[in-house]
Amino acid sequence: MQDHNRHVWDERVRKGLLHTRTARDDEFKNPLKAINGRGWITGSIKGKHVLCLAGGGGLQAPLYAAAGAHVTVVDISQEMIDQDKRIAQERGLELNALVGSMDDLSIIENASFDLVTQPVSTCYVPNILKVYDELSRVLRFW
């Protein structure tokens, strides 16, 4: 299943299809507003450690980085990760971009993140409980 999903997302990027667009110039003018349209994030995220889980593509991770967060993005698609790297380089942003599956975050240490963001994506894993087990391990709880 994961190999199939990886291939499909890589192809979607190559074709420029829906859900593969990168962040726009206007979104970088106020990156926190662009990523926080519903107002769920209160205050600044400057200096916070943010995991963009299955959030590759050059949209979310660069905007979080532009808002001052220390960002790691994990995505199953190399093409989506490459877009994050390209946008970060073009904008002079730092982010850690990793190819991996959201249900196996063994490449990440325990209690590494203050915030996790995840677009609709758990429908792509065979066992959602593994995802949430991994999230509970990598999140910091204050």
Predicted regions and their residues:
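Conserved class I S-adenosyl-L-methionine
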Residues: 1-46, 59-60
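A short, aliphatic-rich alpha-helical micro-motif
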Residues: 44-45, 109-110, 132
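Class I SAM-dependent methyltransferase SAM/SAH-binding core
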Residues: 48-105
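A short acidic, Gly/Pro-enriched loop at the edge of an enzyme's catalytic core
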Residues: 103-116
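A short SAM/SAH-binding and catalytic strip from SAM-dependent methyltransferases
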Residues: 114-129
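A short glycine-rich, Lys/Arg-flanked "PGG" loop and its adjoining helix->strand segment in the class I
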Residues: 129-142
